[in-house]
Amino acid sequence: MKPNIHPDNYRTVLFFDSSANEGWLIRSCAETHGKTMVWTDGKEYPLFSLDTSSASHPVYTGKQRNVNTEGHASKFNQRFQSVMSSFRKDK
């Protein structure tokens, strides 16, 4: 790595996904606002909290929710059926 090309706050940061209870140590300049956490190696690292990651996102975990599109289409048709029938009567 070339010297003097990274900002002063380039350090090891713990990125932690609380919903999956998983974390990763990555060198980063991410702002952690003074939050820290003790990791499994016993050392304390700056903490960057994640709402979702590959460990918890349904696309990556395979736990996707199937949406019943037929139900959505029938609701749409019911809602606008009266509008469409009055439109057809006017012509």
Curated annotation (Swiss-Prot):
**A Pfam family name for this chain?**
Ribosomal_L31
Q: Which PROSITE patterns match?
A: RIBOSOMAL_L31
GO BP annotations of the record are: translation
Keywords on this record?
Ribonucleoprotein, Ribosomal protein
Gene Ontology cellular-component terms listed: ribonucleoprotein complex; ribosome
Q: Name one GO molecular function term.
A: structural constituent of ribosome
Taxonomic superkingdom: Bacteria
Among InterPro entries, the record links this protein to:
Ribosomal_bL28/bL31-like_sf, Ribosomal_bL31, Ribosomal_bL31_B, Ribosomal_bL31_sf
Family per record = Belongs to the bacterial ribosomal protein bL31 family. Type B subfamily.
What does the subunit section of this Swiss-Prot or TrEMBL entry state? Answer: Part of the 50S ribosomal subunit.
What name has this protein been given in UniProt? Large ribosomal subunit protein bL31B
Species name for this entry?
A: Neisseria meningitidis serogroup A / serotype 4A (strain DSM 15465 / Z2491)
Q: Lineage of the native species?
A: Bacteria, Pseudomonadati, Pseudomonadota, Betaproteobacteria, Neisseriales
User: Corresponding gene?
Assistant: rpmE2
